[in-house]
Amino acid sequence: MKKVIILGSTGSIGTQTLEVISSRRDQFEVAGISAGGSDVGSLAQQIIDFSIPVVAVAREDAAEELQRALAVQAGSRGRIVPNPRILTGPDASTELAAMPADVVCNAITGAAGLRPTLATLAAGTTLALANKESLVIGGRLVTQAAASGQIVPVDSEHSAFAQCLRGGGRNEVRRLVLTASGGPFRGRDRASLADVSAAEAMKHPTWNMGRVITINSSTLVNKGLELLEAALLYDVDLDDITVVVHPQSIVHSMVEFWDGATIAQASPPDMRLPIALGLSWPDRLPDAAAGCDWSTATQWTFEPLDNDTFGAVELARRAGHAAGTAPAVFNAANESCVDAFCAGSIGFLDITDTIAAVLDEHLSGDENDTLGARHVGDEALTLDAVLAADAWGRRRAAEVCARGIRR
């Protein structure tokens, strides 16, 4: 019986992780869950459904509200009111991540996942990582803290890489091929995207995801983050990772070996498969998701990425080459811009333009003594430097958005 802690349990990946566990209660026990606290009702339902002993909520004042929700839901279902240990505050998920477990699934959105990721690794627990941002911004701080095999990716693309890489030696790899659906605006030119709305950007063609990752997929920022994640996870040079557009989202990624062979992982788009692998790696769980239907004619297509229209991937590659605090600024500026875009304060194209402007400023070498503004390289990277760069990147992006982009 594996004990599992789920961070970000009320989000898309968190709820699907519980779904995977629900039909396998003889194999997995949920030892704790965490959430931001905006959906206390769902959190209470999860606690009751899975008899969860510990829950962490980022919102300081959530404890009483959660206890009331537990009483109401338990009463309506004729159940005894549970009395879990409730941790609250910004460090609650980090405290939970350090508790005894076999697997911690980090499904928190954004840079807030960094401290829980480091706490999980320090505890020696297997990390099923859906929070790519913590690896991207933490960089070598995360990879150096991890034992061999301790991080198991939950992103479908990186799970695909892990599976494909078992088909050859690491020294035999020529390149990684990272697939992208192309998002809702595939095939459109830059000028046609000037007036698209957040509602349009939320209409992903193949995946049902949370707000931030869906907007990131429309700008291709998500693919840029995945590029950085792949380089760090598998110690592959950024220039040996190619991004190709595959609209059907069936081939989740590929590995090309030095003899010319390419191994691909294919399955219908369903996050339950990489989640199940994240919980059970290197073993597979039977019937984790439906397989491909080979009884009907089908077509898989691949096309090059339009970097002129969607410049986020090359921006991410630039940040990755600079390393150190640059990826943290790339991610922070994006998160700030996504908030502004969803609030209607900036246009769609302003997202990547603002990221570029803020990243340029961070890497320019100007004598800016503002905490976090100046680039720190890998050789001097610390957690404080990453957090300062993250905070500066958010503030600076918000300032640029407020007064308009000047490049």
UniProtKB/Swiss-Prot annotation:
Single Gene Ontology MF annotation: NADPH binding
Disulfide topology: none
Cofactor: Mg(2+); Mn(2+)
Record: residues binding NADPH: 10-13, 36, 131, 133, 210
Pathway where this protein functions: Isoprenoid biosynthesis; isopentenyl diphosphate biosynthesis via DXP pathway; isopentenyl diphosphate from 1-deoxy-D-xylulose 5-phosphate: step 1/6
GO biological process: isopentenyl diphosphate biosynthetic process, methylerythritol 4-phosphate pathway involved in terpenoid biosynthetic process
Residues that coordinate or bind Mn(2+): 155, 157, 226
Pfam family, any one: DXP_redisom_C
Catalyzed reaction equations: 2-C-methyl-D-erythritol 4-phosphate + NADP(+) = 1-deoxy-D-xylulose 5-phosphate + NADPH + H(+)
UniProt KW keywords: Isoprene biosynthesis, Manganese, Metal-binding, NADP, Oxidoreductase
E.C. designation(s): 1.1.1.267
Binding residue positions for 1-deoxy-D-xylulose 5-phosphate: 132, 156-157, 181, 204, 217, 222-223, 226
Entry function: Catalyzes the NADPH-dependent rearrangement and reduction of 1-deoxy-D-xylulose-5-phosphate (DXP) to 2-C-methyl-D-erythritol 4-phosphate (MEP).
Family: Belongs to the DXR family.
PANTHER family per record: 1-DEOXY-D-XYLULOSE 5-PHOSPHATE REDUCTOISOMERASE, 1-DEOXY-D-XYLULOSE 5-PHOSPHATE REDUCTOISOMERASE, CHLOROPLASTIC
Name of the protein described by the UniProt record: 1-deoxy-D-xylulose 5-phosphate reductoisomerase
Lineage, opening ranks: Bacteria, Bacillati, Actinomycetota, Actinomycetes, Propionibacteriales
Gene responsible for this protein: dxr
